[in-house]
Amino acid sequence: MFKRRLSMFMAAMGMAFSLVACSGAKTADTKSAETKAVEETTKSEAKSESTDKKNVVVTTSFLQDMVEQLAGDTVNVELIIPAGEDPHLYVAKPEDYTKLSSADLTLYHGLHFEGKMVDALEAGGVAVSKDFPKDRIGTMDEGGEIITDPHFWFDIDLYKMAVGVAATSLENLNPEYKDKYEENKVKYLDELTQLDKYVRENITSIPKESRYLITPHDAFNYFSRAYDIEVKAPQGVSTESEVANQDIQETIDFIVEHKIKAIFAESTTDPARMEKLKEGAAAKGADVKIVSGEGNELFSDSLAPKGQDGDTYIDMYKHNVKLITENLK
């Protein structure tokens, strides 16, 4: 509907432009080149509309990439939480609910990752985590409360399960493309298997005594479990949680005790938090480097914006592993 209205608006603008351009001309039938261009654009958009592609709404850049890998250009993909923004802190806008209400299919993470939108998503969406075995879903004790860890995408095996759910949902949406989606799924799953080998080879190349990953918030526990690298962060699984002085001090003591030489900022968190860790470690005689700045931050809760390094799941994972390996070896 929105596109149709936009096309009508552009056509009306074209007519207005034509009347101005033709003022004083010999015949009213004379059309400017600009008007013709507008009309061609309108026709092109009308043709695009006639293809009637289904609208798939996704909550995050991870799922946007997943759908694009599986469905290519057979669907229109609309993203709710822009790449680079923190999903834990994202507040839904009125237009987000408009997208959801007009979606033919909505895919979301589940596991309380989209907590502020969960009611709307559960009402009509598909959680890609819905088939995860319960014993594979991570939990943490935060202040005596057991919290579900939503960062499953750092366990590539779980991510593969999510791909399977997304593929089935797309096949149900567009049965005529089932063979194409199946072919793309098989290809993508093979690429993810190769990614797992890449990650394992690189992380195991880090000496065991140096294999510690310090980040601003607890987003890497699935990564830790899958690749035998101990992780620690002063903040919990959600960036909404409070950062207690005790947690900061415990992290500082951990850095000093294990002689950790590098700690990592994340693309969606405040790098100032890592400065506190560096200063605290320095006060105890430890020299620790903060790995941060454009192109040197870990991706945790979002992929990079389109066109930047890390704008696909596989590229994001390789970026993270390269950064970790280079700074901890």
Which residues fall in each region the model found?
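Sec-dependent N-terminal signal peptides
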Residues: 7-13
